[in-house]
Regions:
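N-terminal first-folded block
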Residues: 2-45
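C-terminal structural segments of small proteins and small subunits
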Residues: 69-108
Length: 109
């Protein structure tokens, strides 16, 4: 599965998803792209999942146009140590049937 890590997340996350083809926005040279343009680029390159900390993205885009799964990591901050506890949840989602559009990933009850 091809995954893209948004520029608002630590690139260190790549090590936790080595079973997948995983790239950062920086790896692809897509820094500072607007969300709509980023989603179009992802479609062209056959990416299937975007990992992001951008909680507004899910309200700003029409996901009928972009059949990409977006995992919105909803935690206190975007540091690796804060993200680490939700990595197993992300793996569960990736191993299941992901729907197109946003899915919030959080540890909050």
């Amino acid at each position: 599965m091809m995954l893209l890590i948004d520029e608002n997340l630590p690139k260190r996350l790549k090590q936790d998803f080595s079973k997948h083809q995983i790239y950062t926005v920086n790896d692809m040279g897509w820094n500072r792209k607007k969300n709509r343009e980023l989603l179009k680029l992802m479609l062209n390159k056959k990416f299937e999942v975007l990992l992001t900390f951008d909680k507004n993205l899910q309200y700003q885009q029409n996901f009928k146009k972009y059949p990409i799964s977006v995992l919105v990591l909803n935690v206190e901050d975007n540091t690796y140590s804060t993200l680490k506890p939700i990595i197993p949840l992300i793996h569960e989602l990736l191993n299941g049937e992901l729907k197109a559009g946003p899915t919030e990933v959080t540890t909050r009850i």
